[in-house]
């Protein structure tokens, strides 16, 4: 039986129902929505190439957004579901800004849809029952080439697929990587509006879903 967790977003944000176990129909529907948006904002050829780089339709459709149970986002299909919500939040946060401070919807959607794609490759199911039961590790880390962060890997995948970024889009693609960086204080604390919108949307995802 599917497990529902419903939440209401402040400031008249939309309501979403996140399931810890998604039916096949929901998985397919979410993937279809994600792919359609990806084609809209990066182009059909680029979108197809990205999905292929990530392992194909099934890999993206079934991918998790996180690895531990306490995040509330470590389940099959959470990647597309969460990224769709992230895109909506980011656009609505932008709408709350004074008009002269707002950034383009196209750039917001592009970055929101692409900035986490590295996670599709990053996680694989945890096969250690003890770690699953005692540590809540539903997924573990896959062995990937290069010691690079999610945002950096996402940029690499997108650019290898023909996607081009403006300076502000490139910065925003890495904004969540910067949270744990101490050396690059300037770029961490003096980021553009697009980066701040994406950062706030990511923080909303965490607050809404994290188990306390």
Please annotate each region the language model reported.
Residues 7-8, 16-67:
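Non-catalytic interface/linker regions that flank or bridge core catalytic/transmembrane domains
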Residues 50-59, 74-84:
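All-alpha helical catalytic cores of prenyl diphosphate-utilizing isoprenoid enzymes
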Residues 67-81, 88-89, 93-99, 103-211:
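Divalent metal-dependent catalytic cores for phosphoryl transfer on phosphate-bearing substrates
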């Amino acid at each position: 039986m599917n497990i529902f967790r419903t939440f209401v977003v402040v400031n008249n944000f939309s309501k979403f129902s996140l399931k810890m176990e998604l039916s096949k129909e929901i998985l397919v529907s979410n993937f279809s929505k994600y792919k359609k948006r990806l084609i809209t904002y990066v182009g059909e050829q680029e979108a197809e190439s990205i999905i292929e780089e990530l392992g194909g339709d099934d890999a993206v459709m079934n991918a998790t957004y996180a690895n531990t149970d306490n995040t509330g986002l470590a389940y099959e299909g959470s990647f597309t579901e969460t990224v769709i919500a992230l895109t909506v939040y980011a656009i609505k946060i932008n709408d709350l800004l004074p008009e002269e401070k707002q950034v383009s919807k196209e750039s917001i959607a592009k970055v929101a849809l692409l900035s986490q794609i590295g996670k599709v490759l990053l996680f694989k199911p945890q096969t250690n029952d003890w770690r699953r039961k005692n540590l809540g590790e539903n997924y573990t880390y896959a062995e990937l080439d290069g010691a690079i962060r999610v945002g950096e890997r996402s940029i690499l995948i997108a650019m290898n697929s023909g996607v081009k970024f403006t300076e502000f889009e490139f910065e925003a693609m890495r904004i969540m990587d910067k949270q744990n960086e101490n050396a690059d204080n300037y770029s961490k604390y003096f980021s553009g509006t697009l980066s701040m919108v994406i950062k706030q949307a990511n923080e909303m995802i965490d607050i809404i879903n994290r188990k306390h």
